[in-house]
Design a protein with these regions (language model features):
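N-terminal secretory signal peptides that target proteins for export/translocation
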Residues: 1-4
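Bacterial N-terminal signal peptides
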Residues: 8-21
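Residue-level detector of intrinsically disordered, flexible termini
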Residues: 17, 23-25, 58, 484, ...
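Periplasmic c-type cytochrome electron-transfer domains
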Residues: 22-418
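Cellulosome-associated attachment modules in secreted, modular CAZymes
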Residues: 410-502
Length: 502
């Protein structure tokens, strides 16, 4: 009886946490999401109502690598539903951090973006990354449930107003954070753009590019849309009435698509609906420990209060976070509190990708943070191993199986394969085992190569002994870096040949 009472109180607390925030911001919009939890509809700005035509245009844009200058990065490249809307490549993709030196304790694990390019397509020797792909200075946050957030990015720099990027006219006075966020990466020379890219460059490229020409396994809704409107001008005309492609319309469409990405069919949602009977004893224990230690930052069905807090992930001077946006000293080192929905899929964690597992995250909170901070109890949470396991079991109930399996509305096309040149065995490291595997493939019998493009070490379109020699020269002879995407980078193979990659 006592356990049921605690569960009911917990559910009511969660529900009240949501209703005090999100409902107040909601404006007339689409029907509520499918049944699964007490989530209100996401707020929708009146200037950008949801329509099926805008949703499908936004979905196509979100998953089209041609939206980047070099055809290698889509929005979805760094925001994969099966990984909770974030980027698993962060485990092996490092930014050197504020000291600009790789391998020190301040490295950041972000997302590979662009090779530094001029807009004629010529690579530029970047002071941090050379001719390799740049890595973002923060880990990619999730786009799932972003529709509910009043501010976006880790520092909250995408806020309520949405200003037309091409003429400075305010298009949305309040509630346009998703539109504002959606357009920023497209001109970022780290994420998707050559150095001096303009919106006219984007426009002309989309006019000339067959939608999703580089992707495979197009989803049924995309196939149906392209059968009627096979090019971008036609898609924009269907969504907006005229074929004009503008930055504002791109932002409107991307935001509209993301407002359909509502995760509300998890075991956690069943728990909110019927109480402790939905969970195992371990998960129920975890829910009670969670309520005692993780409120109010992670409360309500959204599992975030949208606040900015400094919790001691890194020293303040490493990254001012919110303080760099507000220019208000007390905000220095504060970062946005993320939703915990689908958190079990989203490793690594925190804005710097600094914790690889949920166990490491809970140990961080147990210790009261890694660095001095005002945002956590000074003595930490003091959970024992059994209690930490229970909290993790509860956090895992927040995984929506549709997200994990990339089922509608989280389904998407397959993007180009990212590979590391020379990594023939696909273990994410280029080492002597790779030329050995190529030798076994060539001379040792029926040994398959999981990625022929990666095994093509010299990028001549043929797997032969020259690839073995090129790899050994790079490993032991001081040879030059391998052809792009080199052994130090990740990316699609820029060379058209008959080789493939599973």
């Amino acid at each position: 009886m006592q356990g049921r009472l605690i569960g009911v109180v917990f559910c009511m607390t969660i529900l009240l946490g949501a209703l005090s925030g999100s409902v107040a911001q909601a404006q007339p919009g689409p029907p509520p999401p499918p049944p699964g939890g007490p989530l209100p509809p996401p707020p929708v700005p009146a200037a950008n109502p949801i329509t099926p035509q805008k949703v499908i245009l936004g979905k196509i844009l979100f998953w089209d690598e041609q939206l980047s200058s070099d055809d290698s990065v889509a929005c979805g490249t760094c925001h994969l539903p099966a990984f909770g809307g974030s980027d698993p490549r962060s485990f092996t993709s490092a930014h050197p951090g504020p000291d600009s030196t790789f391998g020190n304790g301040d490295d950041i694990f972000g997302s590979p973006g662009m090779i530094t390019l001029d807009c004629g397509g010529t690579p530029i020797d970047d002071p941090l990354f050379g001719f390799e792909r740049q890595v973002t200075g923060r880990k990619s946050p999730t786009m799932i449930m972003a529709a509910y957030a009043p501010t976006l990015f880790w520092d909250g720099r995408a806020e309520g107003p949405f200003v037309d990027p091409e003429n400075g006219v305010i298009l949305i006075n309040n509630g346009g954070a998703l539109e504002a966020q959606s357009v920023e990466p497209i001109l970022s020379s780290v994420e998707m753009a050559c150095e001096t890219r303009t919106w006219n460059d984007v426009r002309q490229k989309l006019i000339a590019s067959p939608p999703l020409a580089l992707a495979t396994d197009l989803t049924p809704d995309i196939v149906a849309a392209l059968a009627v409107n096979p090019d971008y001008p036609a898609l924009f005309a269907s969504a907006f009435g005229t074929p004009d492609i503008t930055a504002a319309r791109i932002g409107f469409a991307l935001a509209t698509y993301q407002r359909t990405l509502i995760s509300n069919q998890s075991p956690f949602d069943e728990f909110l609906a019927i109480g402790p009977a939905a969970l195992t004893p371990q998960e129920n224990q975890g829910s009670q420990l969670f309520a005692q230690n993780c409120f109010p930052c992670h409360a309500g069905p959204l599992q975030t209060d949208h606040s900015f807090r400094r919790i001691g992930v890194r020293p303040v001077q490493d990254d001012l976070g919110r303080g760099a946006i507000t220019n208000f000293g007390p905000d220095n080192g504060d970062f946005k509190t993320p939703t915990l929905r689908n958190v079990a899929l989203r490793a690594p964690y925190f804005h710097n990708g600094g914790k690889e597992t949920l166990q490491e995250v809970l140990q961080f909170y147990n210790a009261g943070g890694d660095f001095p901070n005002p945002g956590l109890p000074p003595n930490g949470t003091n959970l024992n191993p059994q209690e930490r396991n229970a909290v993790i079991a509860f956090l895992e109930t927040m995984t929506d199986p549709r997200v994990a399996a990339a089922l509608p509305p989280f389904d998407h096309p397959t993007l180009q394969t990212y590979l590391r040149r020379g990594d023939a065995n696909q273990d994410e490291v280029f080492d002597v085992s790779d030329p050995i595997l190529i030798l076994e493939h060539l001379f040792g019998g029926p040994v398959s190569l999981p990625c022929e493009d990666a095994a093509d070490t010299n990028d001549d379109g043929v797997i032969d002994v020259a690839d073995v020699m090129r790899g050994l020269d790079r490993l032991f002879g001081g040879g030059t870096p391998l052809p792009l995407p080199s052994e130090r980078s990740l990316g699609p193979d820029p060379t058209a040949d008959s080789l493939g990659c599973n």
